[in-house]
Regions:
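An extended, acidic, His-containing surface patch that forms the Zn2+-binding/catalytic region
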Residues: 250-294, 302, 318, 322-323, ...
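A non-catalytic alpha/beta surface segment that caps or lines the substrate-entry region
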Residues: 1-16
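Short, conserved charged micro-motifs
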Residues: 13-14, 217-226, 318-324
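Fold-level recognition of mixed alpha/beta catalytic cores in primary-metabolism enzymes, strongest
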Residues: 84-174, 182, 186
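Acidic-enriched catalytic cores of C-N bond-cleaving enzymes acting on peptides and small amides
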Residues: 126, 143-148, 167-197, 217-292, ...
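Active-site metal-coordination/substrate-binding segment of hydrolases
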Residues: 12-94, 99-110, 132, 147-150, ...
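Short beta-strand-to-loop capping motifs
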Residues: 6, 155, 213-217, 311-315
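C-terminal catalytic subdomain
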Residues: 300, 306-325
Length: 370
């Protein structure tokens, strides 16, 4: 964590202290064809019309906008103010360890303004709590039979995004698309799974999923046609949100072994049944998501013979979050997986009568008239 303090303007020492809070980390997500080391390479930012964006990676505006805003307040001499503190926490995107590690009493301010938002003209007055579901399948190897063809099944071109901010946009999930194809292909053509690598980060909507499957030589053409037909159906269903969805099926090297059929079947059904996306909208604030979940990761490990999946559940109502967690646990435990929870943190309940909210609304209204 980083804490920066700025003394009050002379004569304003008796005013209430203000804490400007943000976080230093970002969601480091990139396209599979982009060569980028987030620990060493700078973000390739460029201007596209009225927007600053990045080339093949996330930009880091979450929470770069908030951090830069707080630093601007610190560096200007044009604002009269009481004591100001800037609190920039670490690992907000991966469990809030920085915030959780903050000792009581370290911050001296009376008012805290959270700068972790990026929508002009909007004030954030609450936030969902979250919890991770860590899912583990153990599997055995089955020898690859004779008379089959190995095919890569790649889902790319989806928008992805932050699983909290972008979840109301109803974007597709590449893992869900992959298993939608696999489920139909197994039922109709007996297609078997050798390996799967879906998603990249626990708090990002999966934009890509890659796998290797095998199919009887005689059924190859039918499977390929089926995969592209399902892909076209998904593109039609998500025409407004996923216009660039791509499905690639092409021959590859035959694997030595497959994930055992029973595990494949049960896991596939669990992924199909797993809740995903917006679960419930708020009854009190129109347009606000109350409860949501995102199937973020699903990856096989051939060396350890395991398949790990991860869901991040969010809700501003703790009891609803716990209910959703138990639903997801039930789905995967019925399929034979082990499910554990981690990283639970509470929500920030909105207070529509907050005097700070009224002040912020008045300050915004003066120059903009709205």
């Amino acid at each position: 964590n980083v804490i920066i303090r700025k003394p009050a303007t002379p004569g304003m020492e008796d005013r209430k202290g203000v804490v400007l809070q943000g976080h230093l980390d970002m969601v480091p997500q990139k396209n599979s064809d982009k060569k980028h080391d987030f620990e060493a390479d700078p973000i390739e930012a460029f201007v596209d019309g009225e927007w600053v964006t990045a080339n093949g990676t996330t930009l880091g505006a979450d929470n770069g906008i908030g951090v830069s805003s707080a630093l601007a307040v610190l560096t200007t001499d044009k604002i009269k103010h009481g004591p100001v503190e800037v609190l920039l926490t670490a690992t907000e995107e991966t469990g809030m360890d920085g915030a959780n590690g903050l000792k009581p009493g370290v911050m001296k301010g009376d008012i805290l303004i959270n700068t972790d938002s990026e929508d002009e003209g909007e004030l954030y007055v609450g936030c969902a709590g979250g919890e991770d579901a860590n899912i583990l399948f153990n599997y055995t190897n089955e020898e690859t039979p004779y008379g089959v063809v190995a095919l890569k099944l790649d889902i790319t071109g989806m928008k992805g995004g932050h699983s909290g901010i972008d979840i109301p946009l109803q974007r597709g999930n590449a893992i869900k698309v992959f298993f939608r194809i696999l489920n139909a292909a197994y039922e109709e053509h007996g297609v078997r799974l050798a390996r799967i690598d879906g998603g990249s980060l626990r708090n990002a909507i999966p934009r890509e999923a890659f796998g290797v499957v095998v199919v009887d030589e005689a059924k190859t053409a039918d499977f390929v046609a089926q995969a592209y037909e399902i892909a076209q159906n998904v593109k039609s269903e998500l025409a407004e949100t996923e216009p660039d969805l791509k499905v690639l099926v092409e021959e590859t090297e035959l694997p030595f072994s497959l994930i055992d059929e029973e595990t494949q079947r049960k896991m596939t059904k669990a992924v199909i049944a797993c809740p995903n996306g917006v679960i419930r909208m708020s009854d009190t604030m129109p347009g606000l998501v109350e409860t949501s979940t995102n199937l973020a990761l699903l990856k096989s490990d051939e060396q350890n013979k395991t398949i790990k999946a991860g869901c991040l559940m969010r809700s501003s109502v703790d009891s609803a979050k716990e209910d959703l967690a138990q639903r997801i646990k039930a789905v995967f435990e019925l399929a034979g997986a082990k499910v554990e929870f981690s990283g639970n943190y509470p929500g920030w309940k909105p207070n529509m009568d907050s005097p700070i909210l009224k002040t912020m609304q008045d300050v915004y209204n003066r120059p903009f008239g709205k």
